[in-house]
């Protein structure tokens, strides 16, 4: 897990996040199975005691409770596109790996894990460097981007690349073997090179903080020496590289290298720090104990974001994370999660500072005092970065693994006496820590109880592994379906593939959302075939009627299932509203369902003018204000539509769609001059729009906006979200 997770990715609906989560959860559960197997084969169970383990348990409970009490359990527990690093299953995987490593690693395991950690960071950085310079290693289009890497964003990789530098600096000074020094130097140069090219300010801040921390650690825990003079000299040497890291970070904070030709690095996108804190405060005000639920930050962002964003390029964007991982965690996990995380940080920090210079520790290699100081400083680097930037999944894994490895180095660095055990349980003193050991005995109720617990753990791990495998299969099927061109000829195959994905993993809302859209397109295919016939034969056959009925039922069921799995997602409600809108001619009451879903979406994102305008259009159509057919206009609904359009313009005075429909209502109400002023504003911003020009001419000539006879009462179809600021096209 330490080595493969940062490097692994696959073609999926989330190339990096989902693939890493699937691998991580599978490896974590396999490690549990291996640990149980080792315990049974050894004939005894040993449990290393440490207070930090209680905070790990507290963090696990926080992840479970925050997911359970979330508005959308499966989204919080499994994650969703772009949101996997802090999902319930990811958090439990980190904590399982922490526990298994802490409880079972010996000296060899620890040494291998340290080299795997360093190697994974080095390979990730090297791959990222090759990509930046256009040397694409993988011959596939999705990966032939200069900013693509195996970790996440270029900023996430920059943090990941620099995170081992404090350890490398400390270990480099203590190791004597020139070959190891050469390897460490190559790693450091490669990782620094990537960070320098990206020039991410937060990476330099974190490096400076960790460098200062390393200086402080060395000051508080000087290396033992034969004499005070030698100790002073060793202390001075130990400060050289940490201070170099600090100076290096400060220099590159102010100095940026010239950009590489053809390389465009996008600026970090996300809410400001102040906005993030404001959203956190409002969320905790309503959901203080467990927060909004893991990986639900975009939902509370949509609900609480400031109206001023409507004047920016991000007016329709709901970010997956706040300005920092720490704020996101507090927002989504609540006070319980904050207490759990702070307890872990505090207890491990105290333990680490107390045990760095354990007097009876083996002082060589990775078990040396400088190596432990470097591990702690690298962990502080990650901790510092969490307060300034969202943490990518591989870096979050390192945040939990490094403390486990640090504690293992204390346990394994002890020289313990070999003893013959005459009792079935024993406490071994180990540098202030303790190991509890129980030997299995036939006929013992204690042994029976432990075996029962082990079987429960084993069964849970096997079930979890099976579930992860099913999710992997579902995602592979779904990706293959998404790669097929969505034409009428391929529609049945796509529907069958997505249905197979759902059969394998029925807990992914996005599968149902896509399925409902494809089913609706299939309905249009059937209707299109009917329309191709001569006019006298344009009536659905019994088979076609049955097919349309079946597709309608499946579409509605898919919409409802998506909403049930992800009820707080404004995008799901908008999709549902649009789907019901398309079913108006086929399903009685579909128009009311569309209105209900847009009202729900408006409650979840109250400052979005697009949603309000869409809702206003539905009320306007239902009011029959423009007199289609024999039904009398409903003035109450028309007034409601008008109020909604006015509110949309309050939210964004430049929102053209809302102004267009409001002006039509004003014209219908006899407020011709006000309507003319609004249409002139639209013409000023859309001078090439023929419909607007004609309406202005009509009003100036004293005739209704839509002319004589009026154009069809149904308002022009609103554009998609991406084009929502434009004016509706002229009806044909």
Cite the ranges covered by each PLM segment.
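Alpha-helical transmembrane segments of multi-pass inner-membrane proteins
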Residues: 1-8, 25-36, 57-67, 88-103, ...
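Transmembrane signal-anchor hairpin modules in multi-pass inner-membrane enzymes, especially those
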Residues: 1-83, 96, 100-119, 170-187, ...
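Conserved structural position within tetratricopeptide repeats
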Residues: 503, 563-564, 599-603, 646-650, ...
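Amphipathic alpha-helical repeat scaffolds of TPR domains
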Residues: 466-486, 503-543, 565-584, 605-629, ...
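Interfacial juxtamembrane loops and adjacent helix segments
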Residues: 131, 136-148, 267-270, 278-279, ...
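Terminal, low-structured helical/coil segments at or just beyond the last alpha-helical repeat
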Residues: 668, 673-732
């Amino acid at each position: 897990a330490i080595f493969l997770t940062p490097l692994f990715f696959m073609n999926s609906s989330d190339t990096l996040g989902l693939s890493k989560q699937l691998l991580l959860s599978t490896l974590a559960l396999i490690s549990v199975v291996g640990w149980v197997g080792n315990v049974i084969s050894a004939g005894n169970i040993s449990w290393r005691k440490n207070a930090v383990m209680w905070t790990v348990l507290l963090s696990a409970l926080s992840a479970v409770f925050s997911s359970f009490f979330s508005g959308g359990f499966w989204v919080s527990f499994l994650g969703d596109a772009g949101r996997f690093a802090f999902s319930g299953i990811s958090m439990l995987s980190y904590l399982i790996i922490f526990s298994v490593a802490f409880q079972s690693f010996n000296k060899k395991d620890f040494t291998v894990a340290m080299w795997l950690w360093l190697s994974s960071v080095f390979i990730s950085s090297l791959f990222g460097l090759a990509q930046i310079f256009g040397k694409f290693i993988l011959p596939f289009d999705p990966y032939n981007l200069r900013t693509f890497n195996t970790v996440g964003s270029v900023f996430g990789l920059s943090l990941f690349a620099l995170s081992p530098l404090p350890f490398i600096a400390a270990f480099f000074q203590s190791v004597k073997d020139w070959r190891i020094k050469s390897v460490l130097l190559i790693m450091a140069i490669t990782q620094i090179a990537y960070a320098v090219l990206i020039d991410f300010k937060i990476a330099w801040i974190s490096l400076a903080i960790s460098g200062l921390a390393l200086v402080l650690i060395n000051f508080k825990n000087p290396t033992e020496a034969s004499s005070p003079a030698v100790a002073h000299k060793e202390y001075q040497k130990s400060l050289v590289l940490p201070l170099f890291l600090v100076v290096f970070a400060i220099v590159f904070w102010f100095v940026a290298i010239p950009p590489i030709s053809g390389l465009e690095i996008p600026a970090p996108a996300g809410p400001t720090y102040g906005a993030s804190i404001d959203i956190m405060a409002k969320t905790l005000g309503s959901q203080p104990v467990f927060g909004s639920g893991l990986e639900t930050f975009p939902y509370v962002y949509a609900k609480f974001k400031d109206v001023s964003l409507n004047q920016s390029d991000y007016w329709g964007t709901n970010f997956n994370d706040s300005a920092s991982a720490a704020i996101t965690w507090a927002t989504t996990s609540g006070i319980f999660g904050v207490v759990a995380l702070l307890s872990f940080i505090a207890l491990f920090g105290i333990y680490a500072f107390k045990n760095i210079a354990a007097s009876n520790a083996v002082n060589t290699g990775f078990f040396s005092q400088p190596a432990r100081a470097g591990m702690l400083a690298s962990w502080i680097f990650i901790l510092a970065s969490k307060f300034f930037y969202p943490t990518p999944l591989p870096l979050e894994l390192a945040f939990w693994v490094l403390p486990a490895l640090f504690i293992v180095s204390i346990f394994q660095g002890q020289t313990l006496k070999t003893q013959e055990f005459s009792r079935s349980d024993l406490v071994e003193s180990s540098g202030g820590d303790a190991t509890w050991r129980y030997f299995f005995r036939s006929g013992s109720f204690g042994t029976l109880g432990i075996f029962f617990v082990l079987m429960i753990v084993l069964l849970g791990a096997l079930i979890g592994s099976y579930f992860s495998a099913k999710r992997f299969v579902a995602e592979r099927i779904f990706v293959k379906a998404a790669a097929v061109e969505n034409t009428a000829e391929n529609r049945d195959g796509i529907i069958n593939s997505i249905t197979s994905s759902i059969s394998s993993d029925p807990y992914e809302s996005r599968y149902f959302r896509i399925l409902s859209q494809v089913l609706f397109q299939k309905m249009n295919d059937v209707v299109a075939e009917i329309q191709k016939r001569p006019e006298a034969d344009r009536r659905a056959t019994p088979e076609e009627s049955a097919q349309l009925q079946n597709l309608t039922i499946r579409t509605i069921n898919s919409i409802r299932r998506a909403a049930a799995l992800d009820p707080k997602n404004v995008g799901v409600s908008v999709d549902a509203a649009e789907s019901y809108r398309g079913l108006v001619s086929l399903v009685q009451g579909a128009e009311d369902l569309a209105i209900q879903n847009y009202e729900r979406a408006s409650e979840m994102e109250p400052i979005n003018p697009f949603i309000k305008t869409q809702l206003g259009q539905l009320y306007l159509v239902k009011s029959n204000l423009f007199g289609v057919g024999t039904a009398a206009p409903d003035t109450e609904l028309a007034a409601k539509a008008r109020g909604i359009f006015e509110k949309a313009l309050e939210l964004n005075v430049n929102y053209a769609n809302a102004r267009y429909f409001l002006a039509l209502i004003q014209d219908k109400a006899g407020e011709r001059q006000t309507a003319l002023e609004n249409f002139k504003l639209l013409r000023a911003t859309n001078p090439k729009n023929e419909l607007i020009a004609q309406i202005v001419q009509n009003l100036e000539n004293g005739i209704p906006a839509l002319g004589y006879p009026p154009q069809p009462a149904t308002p022009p179809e609103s554009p998609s979200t991406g084009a929502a600021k434009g004016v509706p096209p002229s009806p044909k």
